[in-house]
């Protein structure tokens, strides 16, 4: 198995360095495929460790492993990562870091799932078969080979704001559509060398394993994903074009792993440019040029009311700069969880 599955890998240098004053929020993206049969019992301990350290974000756990992105202070992130490593079934794992000056998540969640990344195909096991890992330093040479077909495994809206030169866009709306794309567009007898990439590497673990099962023998994928490539390859040598979409409030990051030039429509969640925000179709919290003709009147009314309630909450002082009503709600939930945990502990003490 590659070091991407077995070692705690974190580069010593980053495009944007940690700064205790400005870039003081650490964003850690992690995953590991592993045999995790009793994963359900770890949901609450993991969640409580995140809450105790004021770490936000979402972690998915399933019988096939763990996946997610979390953010917090340097000490908070280190404490959570140390706890995850202490779980025997998880142990060491790869994670990628970037830094920002504002909390990119509002919520703290640990979800129980059937899969840590959903492809919708049964019995795809990256622990048994997977593509060949290619380090960021070797990626340019591989994708410059005219015999290699380069495929972006991400969703269409991600591809549109940035991708590698000459990459093929499968035009999928979700990762579940990828197997259908392969069946229709790719042929092991014609496409002898296939290179694939995604944001952090996890989708390629599944997609390359699937490709191997379909008879594609020479399948490669970018180790650590786009984020690791942007971290390690200088912009002057880069074959990446545009921003990289990320699943948090930063929306996208540029080549320096700093917040990119995109915002997000809170109605449809699509990345939008500053120019699109000047469009008559853009109404904050309600619509944008991507969804103005897709949302029903009922949906628009619901979006409008949500935006209204958020503004009212801010006026009441329930939210403050750098936060919003969702953050307040999540803090209340966290307090309830803590109260329930203490009550359970007290009941167990009495019973004993």
From Swiss-Prot:
Domain Rhodanese: 144-238
Catalytic activity: uridine(34) in tRNA + AH2 + O2 = 5-hydroxyuridine(34) in tRNA + A + H2O
Record-linked InterPro entries: Rhodanese-like_dom, Rhodanese-like_dom_sf, TrhO, TRHO_N
Assigned keywords, A-Z: Oxidoreductase, tRNA processing
Enzyme class, UniProt record, top EC level: oxidoreductase
Organism domain of life: Bacteria
Active site: 198
EC numbers, comma separated: 1.14.-.-
GO molecular function, one term: oxidoreductase activity, acting on paired donors, with incorporation or reduction of molecular oxygen
SUPFAM superfamilies cross-referenced by the UniProt entry: Rhodanese/Cell cycle control phosphatase
GO BP terms in the entry: tRNA modification
Family that this chain belongs to: Belongs to the TrhO family.
Entry function: Catalyzes oxygen-dependent 5-hydroxyuridine (ho5U) modification at position 34 in tRNAs.
PANTHER family with a match to the protein in the record: RHODANESE-LIKE DOMAIN-CONTAINING PROTEIN 7-RELATED, THIOSULFATE SULFURTRANSFERASE/RHODANESE-LIKE DOMAIN-CONTAINING PROTEIN 2
NCBIfam families: PRK00142.1-4
Protein name: tRNA uridine(34) hydroxylase
Gene designation per UniProt: trhO
């Amino acid at each position: 198995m590659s070091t991407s599955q077995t070692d705690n890998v974190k580069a010593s240098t980053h495009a944007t360095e940690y700064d205790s004053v400005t870039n003081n929020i650490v964003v850690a993206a992690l995953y590991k495929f592993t045999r995790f049969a009793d994963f359900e019992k770890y949901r609450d301990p993991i969640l409580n460790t995140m809450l105790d350290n004021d770490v936000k974000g979402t972690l998915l756990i399933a019988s096939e492993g763990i996946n997610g992105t979390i953010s917090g202070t340097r000490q908070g992130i280190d404490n959570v990562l140390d706890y995850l490593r202490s779980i025997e079934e998880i142990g060491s794992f790869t994670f990628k870091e970037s830094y920002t000056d504002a909390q990119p998540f509002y919520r703290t969640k640990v979800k129980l799932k059937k899969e840590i990344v959903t492809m919708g195909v049964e019995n795809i096991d990256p622990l048994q078969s997977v593509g060949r890992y290619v380090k960021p330093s070797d990626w340019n040479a591989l994708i410059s080979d005219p015999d290699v077909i380069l495929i972006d495994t991400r969703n269409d809206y991600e591809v549109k704001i940035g991708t590698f030169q000459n990459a093929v866009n499968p035009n999928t709306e979700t990762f579940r559509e990828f197997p259908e794309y392969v069946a229709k567009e790719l042929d092991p007898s014609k496409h002898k060398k296939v290179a694939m990439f995604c944001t952090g590497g996890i989708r390629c673990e599944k997609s390359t394993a699937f490709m191997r099962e379909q008879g594609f023998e020479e399948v490669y994928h970018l180790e650590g994903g786009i984020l690791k490539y942007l971290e390690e390859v200088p912009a002057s040598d880069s074959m990446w074009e545009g921003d990289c979409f990320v699943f948090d409030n930063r929306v996208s990051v540029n080549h320096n792993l700093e917040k990119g030039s995109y915002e997000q429509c809170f109605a449809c969640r699509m990345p939008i440019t500053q120019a699109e925000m000047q469009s008559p179709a853009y109404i904050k919290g309600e619509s944008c040029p991507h969804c103005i003709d897709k949302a029903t009147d009922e949906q628009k009314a619901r979006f409008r009311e949500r935006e209204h309630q958020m503004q009212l909450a801010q006026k009441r002082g329930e939210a403050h700069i750098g936060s919003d009503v969702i953050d307040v709600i999540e803090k209340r939930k966290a307090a309830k969880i803590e109260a329930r945990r203490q009550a359970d502990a007290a009941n167990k003490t009495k019973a004993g």
